A protein has these predicted regions:
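Internal, well-ordered domain-core segments that constitute the primary functional module
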Residues: 109, 115-223
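Terminal catalytic/cofactor-binding subdomain
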Residues: 1-121, 152-165, 205, 218, ...
Length: 497
């Protein structure tokens, strides 16, 4: 398939929190039941027959779905995680992501436990101090110089994009020294005990914060880190085969959160793809570096006056809106007019920055934190509550309920108060159909054929290839390729055998 210069592969992984009535047993057991129903009853995917990780992803903990995505239970039953298919189009990504939520909701309803079980794409546990990741993946040039130098020009964008990408949060957390940091052997011997950063660092409520832009800003303690269980970072240098091919590899962004608003979700991913490209092309000035990225991250998130000032390495102070405008100008000057998707990103990036500069609170149709703040303020006013009341955390949480019949966000959306990118029909279609222009297409077709062959004793799916028996392996190294021919060839051989 011809590849245009502006093509970029991207995908998102979302960890879900689950609350269940005690009568159903543990949340872990409920999560297992949801996963089993999706694979064994609805047959929406091929369950793993092999362990991908002996501790965190044993055999049968999940698998690849017909829509090209992957659903699994991470960290030995702790939570459901959904990784979208590889996508090139923002609308495909939004639809594929929402389709995963609908699959989970469908399983809950058909099992008959919708009154007892709630699943959330909330990125923080207000009371336990845990966080749930929403990690972004981008195909980038495999260049060590990017990690050594380019990330310094990337951090200012990542730190300040929360002004339009943040989902909002009631309250805040303070990380303390907490329990003693475990030694390496202790972690090896007891890996499951150290899933949560709160087992290494103490987490306490911050009484001085009423509302902030980001759910995860308080929990980020490194700019870049490979051992992410102890070092919540902006970036995880996961140079591996997930999207790797032809001089390109995977960039794994850890600092993100689960947008309910489709517009905010797409703008977050879209602007990030353009900034990555500008960095690869050497267009971002070397002096565009923050003095202290992590301090700026928290200060922007907690600024109740919406000035969002950050300090650059050279001592200049600049607003986050103006800093974002600098990235916008770089990308617009270089890439405007090359395709409809790029122009959509650029025009809406500019529009949202204009709105943030004029009156942020008018942007509730496009920005999650604004919509959530309005809901919380309305509830607080009606009930006569102050900001310390735990009921406000419940409003925050229910904004992220993935069931459209329960979610405060979806109620807002059903009233026509949000800017949508996809239709409900698009989402339903994406529950079974993969993106048509990436390798997810070929992998999806192989999942379908494995499911059609009852009693298949052996298969092994991965992002970059599929083993159909112990003698054959279909390689899928290029994420841009649909891989139609290998699929067709296996179809013929399987019919003949």
């Amino acid at each position: 398939m011809p590849r245009e210069t502006y093509d970029r592969i991207f995908g998102v992984e979302t960890e879900f929190g689950t609350l269940a009535e005690e009568t159903l047993g543990t949340p872990e057991g409920v999560v297992e039941a949801i996963k089993d129903y999706l694979f064994y009853e609805l047959k929406l995917g091929a369950i793993d027959l092999h362990a991908r990780d002996d501790v965190f992803e044993p055999a049968a903990s999940g698998g690849f779905l017909m829509n090209g995505a992957r659903l699994y239970i991470d960290a030995v039953g702790s939570h459901l995680e959904y990784a979208t298919a590889e996508c090139r189009q923002l609308k495909d990504l939004v639809a594929n992501d929402r389709a995963g939520q609908r699959q989970i909701v469908r399983a809950i309803k058909e099992i008959g436990v919708e009154d007892e079980v709630n699943v959330y794409n909330n990125s923080v546990d207000h009371f336990g101090g845990h966080t749930f990741g929403c990690h972004e993946n981008y195909l980038v040039r495999a260049d060590d110089d990017f990690l050594n130098n380019g990330v310094n020009q990337f951090y200012p964008f990542l730190v300040t994009r929360q002004i339009f990408a943040g989902v909002g949060r009631v309250g805040g957390h303070v990380l303390t020294n907490g329990p003693a940091r475990p030694n390496y052997q202790e972690v090896l011997d007891n890996p499951v005990d150290y899933i949560w950063v709160s087992n290494v660092y103490g987490v306490e409520p911050d009484p001085y914060v009423q509302f902030q832009l980001s759910q995860r800003a308080d929990h980020i303690i490194k700019t870049i880190a490979s051992r992410v269980r102890f070092n919540r970072a902006l970036i995880n240098p996961k140079w591996e085969h997930f999207y790797s091919h032809d001089g390109m590899t995977r960039l794994h962004l850890l600092f993100g959160e689960s947008n309910q608003n489709e517009f905010a979700y797409a703008l977050k991913i879209g602007t990030t793809t353009l900034v990555i490209r500008a960095l690869e092309d050497g267009l971002v000035p070397e002096e565009m570096v923050l003095w202290q990225p992590l301090i700026a991250l928290r200060e922007v998130s907690r600024d109740a006056d919406y000035r969002w000032l950050v300090t650059m390495l050279d001592g200049r102070t600049i607003s986050s809106v103006d800093l974002q405008r600098q990235y916008l100008k770089i990308c617009a000057d270089a890439y405007r007019g090359e395709c409809a998707q790029t122009d959509w990103i650029l025009s809406n990036w500019e529009s949202i920055l204009d709105g943030l500069e004029t009156d942020p609170l008018t942007l509730g149709d496009r920005i999650d934190w604004v919509a959530k703040l309005k809901m919380v303020e309305e509830y607080r006013s009606e009930e006569g509550l102050d900001w310390t009341d735990d009921a406000l955390h419940s409003v925050d949480l229910e904004y992220h309920n993935i069931d459209p019949d329960k979610s405060l966000f979806h109620a807002y959306q059903q009233m026509g108060q949000t800017t949508r990118l996809v239709s409900d029909l698009d989402i339903v279609t994406a529950m079974t159909d993969p993106p048509s222009d990436t390798r997810a297409y070929g992998r999806s077709k192989l999942v379908e054929r494995v499911l059609a062959r009852k009693g298949q004793k052996f298969y092994m799916f991965d992002w970059s290839g599929v083993a159909l028996d112990r003698q054959s392996y279909i390689e899928m190294p290029d994420p841009f390729d649909r891989y139609e021919q290998p699929v067709d060839q296996w179809g013929k051989s399987s019919q003949g055998g």
